[in-house]
Amino acid sequence: AAAQRRQNDSSVFLAIMVAAAVESESSLTDGDAGALLLQDISEWDEVFRFDRLEAVERAAHAAAAAAFGAFVARGDWTASAAAAFQAAGKQIAFMAAFSTVAGAKGSATVRDADAFAAKFASAAALQELVGNNSPISFFIFDLLFAAILFASKAKAANQAAFAAAAELAAESLFVRLPSLHQVSFFALAGFAAVAAHRHMNGYGSHTFKLVAKDGSVYCSKFWYKADQGQAAEVWKDAEEVAAEDVDYFRDLNFQAEAAGRYPLWELASQVMTFSDFEIDPFNENIPTKVVPRESVPLIVDAELLLNRNPLNMFAEVEQVFMDVAAASKGADEVEDPLIQRQFAYIDTHLSELTASYGIPVCRPYATVLNDQEDGARYDDVQDVLVIAPNAFSASAVEVQIPAAAAFNLAAARVAAAGDVRVNAVVEADQRKQSRQFWASDVNAQKKRLVDAFRMEVASAVSASIQVDVTVEFSFVAAAAAARIAAAVGSAAAGALANRRQIKVIASLAVLAKADAKVRQKNALESSSQAVAVDAKAAAQDIVDSSDAANVVTVAREFAVLPQTAAADAAEFVAAASAKAFSSFPAMEVISVAAAAGAVAEPARASLDLNMAMFFSRIVASRGAAANAIAALVKASRDGVFVAAVLAKAAANNRAAEAIFKFEVRQAVDA
């Protein structure tokens, strides 16, 4: 039954317990933005099974290192949270655990996302944050947690890591849309090949609610900024270090702290209100997106100092238990569907590390007051009746816990809305921040990212995976995708060209009027054979689309077109592809681009002019810029072009041609 659980490439699996088909990429939630529901048995079956598959020290984040030290509060921020350890000057015990995701218990010196988990413990509070060295996560819903980790763990047949097979890693990490931002633009850009954990920033990943004593609620994202500076290794150096010492990271941290070179981090936060999320285009429940510091500045709250190495690796590192549900008074979670994997953390502890939380490195500093007894390592023996309430004697909880100690939690931001099954993969505009990341990179960093992609994609045996990764990347960085396609072979390059051609046609739907949608649909379907692509799905999008607000994104995506004009298609792909492109006149492209600018941002009258100038480079490469734009103006397709546009385009024809040729050279460089 287990072997037949998943049905090939379908997004449906058979739930073992109920023998029924269940969507594998959706979760049952309380409304579109509400919490996950406990009655979604198929989801928890998937999550809890993963908790029990291997010993905890051989599953996720197995190649770990850790150290101990102190948290020292810099300022008094109890106004925004009631946690006991947040008063100015307060010092409590602190532990940081670093680990890589991929592999079983292999080298930590690999290009991978590195976990940065933190445990803050005092006699009055326990707070644990589980994050990594990028401010975002791989995915949105906890349902995909096991699937992503399986992609980087050992195969059952030979214990070789899945990640060692490039096509499997690419399929699971590069092609899945929510993970593109994390893996492609943080891991491959160099943030994952960190020089040392002491030179690594950390992030809490999720948004947390901070509840003040008066009941007011704030949201916060936590950052750990390395006082030693952030540093990464180039890939060649990382390979050499790994060859010399597979435990380089562990050794480096241990030796530095043994010599008294203690690393220090600043704990900073971005504090927001829910109204801030309504003004800015962010969502507190989506862990795959960054809240830019330009929008919400960082506030430094405390220092984190590590000054003691572990005495026993197994006892103090491999047995350490982090729980995203462990929160001090006044700290609460938002309705983030990924952080609700907290059930899995507790379940893992109970199944692997005893039922009484008795392991010293995991034991809370606070006095334990509850009505629980028995289980491995149980030593809290009390002469009280452990049934509450009861008519014979007060329980430990009733006797010793004052009412004032109760948590003050925030009310749900979203009112109950009924059971809804929400797709765990699709969320609006997951590529936007990847584009912004690419645009903000300097050229040297862009080259490193492209080189990393070339290596990863070229290593994939499957041509279809090469195609999928290259096409997905093209939505974000067109010129770079063309360079990757040229490096990995004609299959990826050809598919990249076809994807762009379909995108040109499908994007017309966003701009088309309702009475033109059927005509656009028919045009797309009739062109599908010419570009050798099944266009039915895109054609249906034309009929269904009514999202005029998306036109800005569409206009920006037209930046992919210079590399797919007929003039250079033969160089990148083949003459047949060049012919396919020529069936859609360049003036059509200019029309769409200009219309996008005019519809989306009418207040910025210069946008349509800029778009026209940009796309005149395409027709300039054909030596017909002035004629094409003249024909477009004569046709008056969209009523956005004027004589000034025509004159400017013609005057800049020669300059546009030179710029376009330069871009082509850049796109196919070595």
From Swiss-Prot:
The protein's annotated catalytic reaction(s) are: 2 H2O2 = O2 + 2 H2O
Instruction: List localization entries.
Output: Peroxisome matrix
Record keywords: Heme, Hydrogen peroxide, Iron, Metal-binding, Oxidoreductase, Peroxidase, Peroxisome
**Would the keyword Metal-binding turn up in this protein's UniProt record?**
yes
Q: Give the record's GO biological process terms.
A: hydrogen peroxide catabolic process; response to oxidative stress
Cellular component (GO) terms are:
cytosol; peroxisomal matrix
Give, as one word, the top-level EC class.
oxidoreductase
Amino acids binding heme: Y345
Which PROSITE patterns does the entry link to? Answer: CATALASE_2, CATALASE_3
> Gene3D superfamilies in the record, alphabetically?
1.20.1370.20, Catalase core domain
An example of a Pfam family matching this protein is Catalase
List its EC numbers: 1.11.1.6
Stored SUPFAM superfamilies: Heme-dependent catalase-like (SSF56634)
Which residues catalyse the reaction? H61, N132
Checking InterPro entries in the record gives: Catalase, Catalase_AS, Catalase_clade2, Catalase_clade2_helical, Catalase_core, Catalase_sf
Q: Which cofactors?
A: heme
Assembly behavior: Homotetramer.
Q: What does this protein do?
A: Catalyzes the degradation of hydrogen peroxide (H(2)O(2)) generated by peroxisomal oxidases to water and oxygen, thereby protecting cells from the toxic effects of hydrogen peroxide.
Family per record: Belongs to the catalase family.
Report the protein name in the record: Catalase
